[in-house]
């Protein structure tokens, strides 16, 4: 539920930023506003994937030698 809310918030922010870009004809500050949010989501996702991989390897070796 939290992921869906944050994704819709990011989409709204992207749309409003693009609207401001059309008015001001500038694109430099758009990336400053958008990138940190996606970078944080990407970092959390990568950490979760690495954690699941490590956990699965540990469980595999624990249960494979029975």
Curated annotation (Swiss-Prot):
Subcellular localization is given as: Host nucleus membrane
Judging by the UniProt lineage, the source's domain of life is Viruses
Q: What is the lineage of its organism?
A: Viruses, Varidnaviria, Bamfordvirae, Preplasmiviricota, Tectiliviricetes
**Entry GO CC:** host cell nuclear membrane; membrane
Protein's name in the database: Early E3 7.7 kDa protein
Q: What are the TM regions of this chain, as residue ranges?
A: 44-64
Where does the record say carbohydrate is attached?
7, 24
In what way does this protein cross or attach to the membrane? Single-pass membrane protein
Keyword vocabulary terms for this entry = Early protein, Glycoprotein, Host membrane, Host nucleus, Membrane, Transmembrane, Transmembrane helix
